């Protein structure tokens, strides 16, 4: 019944799931949920049960919730080795396992998480940056009635499937936390077990799940080309040389800011890749110590993950949302995403910078 509480729950649940699954996967789940909500109201509009004005109200409400969820994936994604693709690369180069990565990032990620949650409450409370759209009780009841109908029609087999998914979800958390196997092996184990226990034995039954990500994949290929050019022309090298020439204490915040600025424009995975390779070279050539290398790795991870919520270019999850089938349905454009992400961008970037300066 409370929009503020609902928004907060979406941010917290998206953050928690992203820490163990991957921000992109969680965004895909959120999109599926929102498409389901959208169709409930689209059918009501078709049957003249709600007015066009009410339908527009619902769309604005869904945009709010979706943006909170998307930012939540970034807040959780920065915390762990599996949250974002570049985290794996950073952990691999630094030689960190799941729990060590979490502990090293915690001085920055935990205060940022709290700041993000406070930001969520404030922008909803004061209805700034086009947030604060409400849903009437009448419209809310339509979701409840639909949920009850789906529950009533759920078969015993479907209930068993849900239990299996829950058990495998717990297996995932324990396997990652205890580092029982490399991350990719754990993922394969889950895919095989899920499909086997749910009786999915044909490729055609899985094919539809991949269609949603095709536009996103096409954009990724373009990004790969851009980064290949950046790497080949050594376009980042002058920036890195300037940063490494500064004092030891200044290197960490400067790396954070440089990574953040570039991650807003280009994809954060590629920015992290280029910068990590450069500091590995610096370590091998004895330009920096191992201790300084670890500090810079934290700055690169937080720098690429936090300020990059500013635009869909930077965060893979945001880009996936923008290219999904949901975005045109609820009227979520590139500029709208940038505008609605702005309060989060400012808060996360500044709190992250303060933590990097004082705690790393």
Predicted regions, residues:
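Juxtamembrane non-transmembrane "cap" segments at the membrane-aqueous interface
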Residues: 80, 133-138, 310-318
């Amino acid at each position: 019944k409370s929009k503020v509480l609902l928004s907060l729950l979406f941010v917290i649940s998206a953050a928690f799931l992203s820490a163990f699954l991957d921000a992109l996967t969680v965004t895909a789940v959120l999109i599926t949920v929102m498409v389901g909500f959208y169709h409930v109201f689209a059918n009501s509009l078709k049957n003249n049960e709600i007015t066009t004005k009410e339908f527009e109200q619902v769309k604005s409400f869904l945009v709010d919730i979706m943006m909170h969820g998307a930012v939540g994936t970034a807040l959780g994604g920065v915390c762990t080795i599996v949250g974002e693709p570049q985290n794996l690369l950073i952990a691999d180069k630094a030689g960190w396992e799941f729990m060590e990565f979490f502990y090293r990032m915690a001085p920055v990620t935990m205060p940022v998480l709290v700041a993000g949650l406070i930001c969520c409450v404030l922008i909803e409370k004061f209805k700034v940056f086009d947030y604060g759209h409400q849903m009437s009780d009448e419209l809310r009841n339509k979701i409840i009635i639909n949920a009850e109908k789906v529950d009533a029609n759920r078969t015993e087999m479907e209930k068993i499937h849900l239990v299996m998914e829950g058990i495998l979800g717990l297996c995932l958390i324990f396997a990652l936390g205890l580092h029982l196997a490399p991350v990719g092996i754990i993922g394969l184990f889950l895919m095989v077990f899920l499909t086997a226990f749910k009786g999915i034995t044909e490729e055609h039954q899985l094919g539809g799940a991949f269609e949603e990500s095709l536009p996103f994949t096409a954009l990724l290929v373009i990004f790969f080309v851009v980064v290949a050019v950046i790497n080949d022309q050594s376009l980042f090298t002058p920036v890195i040389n300037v940063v490494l020439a500064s004092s030891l204490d200044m290197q960490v915040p400067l790396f954070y800011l440089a990574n953040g600025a570039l991650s807003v424009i280009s994809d954060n995975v590629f920015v992290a890749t280029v910068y990590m390779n450069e500091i590995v070279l610096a370590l091998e050539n004895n330009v920096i110590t191992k201790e300084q290398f670890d500090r810079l790795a934290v700055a690169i991870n937080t720098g690429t993950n936090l300020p990059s919520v500013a635009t869909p270019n930077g965060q893979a999850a945001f880009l996936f949302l923008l290219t999904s089938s949901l975005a045109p349905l609820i009227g979520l454009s590139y500029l709208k995403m940038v505008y609605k992400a702005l309060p989060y961008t400012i808060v996360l970037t500044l709190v992250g910078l303060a933590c990097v300066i004082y705690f790393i």
